[in-house]
């Protein structure tokens, strides 16, 4: 029986033999489609190839693409664990043709793989085609010998594939497997098609049109093929199973869950184990691809999946975090096919453990609240939306988690009520995914790249060069010239200006032609082009002209120093904190650097000092900074760190810095820092000058941020600090060496004086004032006092003294400070069952025009804006006591 790993390999090997390039799975966070939350099909990374906006050095491709469907249009979360074939994470096997072959080859490829390589009996297969697609039907009859009754024509959109409201589309043919009459269900298109007898295993899309926003369709530049076959589904078939969760891979994760919770994998907790197994995959792969749990966007979807799995672990009786203990089982199954899983294992485990630990603090209380709410409702009534919102807002229960919990009890949620309470938050979430604005003007950059090719970057070796102006874009439109006052983007055939990427900001400088000048204010990338953002300062600039280009040298030098220091900082952090540290973002600007990295807690002062010292040690060593060009695989084999979120081509730049015996990295195994990086760097580490860490802060959940200065900026910062120290020393009339002791003495002296002042205030307050004698009100002694200028923080002590004076009774203290009142009330312990200080102080506050007040039955405080009615406040309290 083939394993899922075997099936994946068989698929890819088949298409490799048939001239296809095996392309790595793209990340779950789409690189080229801002409208998608997660990659949800194999064709996502090839979308621009289908539309003709992107060309690659191959026209046939095959992939095993990791996908997530849990949020937005494609959302399988609610059904996961309860059905045989729903998943949040799945693998999509696919083969693709970009204007190479079409139906006449795609159909034979599919038939041969299924019937020969996978050895599926021919008589078990049937297909559907779009009702007008006579060509596909004819090919199926010719290639597979299928009779007409096993080639079913479907007139609905089930056989016309569209990625969304816009984009590539076309008719498709779906291949089904017939499990036989012992399983209920009818063929596709019949009234009983929802049964499990006929299961779709492969969808072949004949990509021939593009759908536009106005509803019209135009032919694609070239006819293409996009196919998709779920690995879990074909795996179940080839392993003789009717349930994806019974395949070898899923079964191993289910058994790991059962072992970790000491429960039966097939007992009453079967559904819980299935949810955990599925969600373990989606959460682990999302974390490996850089998504961290948060309260918005992708991070919120990740958190929802995590918490759903954690609730099911809780229902299995798990008292401690479980999910992180299952990661090794997942890595054993899938780490070979997806190395990023192995590389990120430590971070995945730490993130899962931290999130589960946090959620468990509120899970029990939230579930108790849910039970209490249900107990108050009539049998079968839905949970009010307000209660569901409270579970979300107070206990961190996403709505679908509450729905999942109620599902087991046959209950539902008043979703409309919940949505009303969540309106503001949902508006923010929608805004987060309304698109980045890149889509509408991307076509012009594709068009220019098609016409002119990519910009050649010369800036590794020079800061001055000449280039030819290929195009000028103003307001998203290709224009014939630019004049003073205009802000435009200029495209050149080559440039020394670095375009913003990898955390390094774009260069600035000057462009000169025979007829004009422009100030370059920024440079960014778009479809391989370097977009020079320019303000024309004099004359006229036109496409076709030659241009002299000069980068701002001082600014570039400062950026280089910061970028190189970032590499040293990354390695020093890994050595100080552990290999789980991975870059999650950076900013290398001329005036500062910022480095975001995966780590779950704040760095101590000692850890920061250790990291800073190590960075400066290597700066002082003044070692060479070397760059080599090699393949990504060779770079990783040498131990190079890849920059998070970057897409690498067939060749990469590998930057090495410093020497460290026994590091195991680099050509000699003794390189300190080794990273894949396309940025600009210093020639020698000594060129950085100095690195000063300003501090460490939280960037997001599980991500820390360090900010630092280098070179002249670091020196200026230290000089400023020294100047401040000198000013403080002069103020203290102490030498720098004596400053600490002097400050400590002043702090202690201040503390003593504050205590003395507080004591004097208490003595002055207790020494007299209006209503200073206790009254007897209905057998209760009541002592009220009006004082001047006593701060609220001193009043509890005075209340204690007043209670001591009366022995048994109630007391009230009103302090008048610039016309505003601070109030405190007290009740001796023997009377708190009859009187509450909270009620007394609220009555006094209301008499003074205030509201509220709070505390304990024996002591409470409040405030009010008008102290002039203090006597009325006393009378109000007397009324409460006598009432």
From Swiss-Prot:
A GO molecular-function annotation: alanine-tRNA ligase activity
EC number(s) reported in the record: 6.1.1.7
Keyword annotations from UniProtKB, A to Z: Aminoacyl-tRNA synthetase, ATP-binding, Cytoplasm, Ligase, Metal-binding, Nucleotide-binding, Protein biosynthesis, RNA-binding, tRNA-binding, Zinc
Principal cellular location given in the protein's record: cytoplasm
Cofactor requirements of the protein: Zn(2+)
Annotated positions binding Zn(2+): 563, 567, 677, 681
Catalytic activity: tRNA(Ala) + L-alanine + ATP = L-alanyl-tRNA(Ala) + AMP + diphosphate
GO annotation, cellular component aspect: cytosol
Biological processes annotated in GO: alanyl-tRNA aminoacylation; negative regulation of DNA-templated transcription
Annotated compartments: Cytoplasm
Function: Catalyzes the attachment of alanine to tRNA(Ala) in a two-step reaction: alanine is first activated by ATP to form Ala-AMP and then transferred to the acceptor end of tRNA(Ala). Also edits incorrectly charged Ser-tRNA(Ala) and Gly-tRNA(Ala) via its editing domain.
Domain characteristics, as noted in the entry: Consists of three domains; the N-terminal catalytic domain, the editing domain and the C-terminal C-Ala domain. The editing domain removes incorrectly charged amino acids, while the C-Ala domain, along with tRNA(Ala), serves as a bridge to cooperatively bring together the editing and aminoacylation centers thus stimulating deacylation of misacylated tRNAs.
Name under which the protein is recorded: Alanine--tRNA ligase
Organism: Cereibacter sphaeroides (strain ATCC 17025 / ATH 2.4.3) (Rhodobacter sphaeroides)
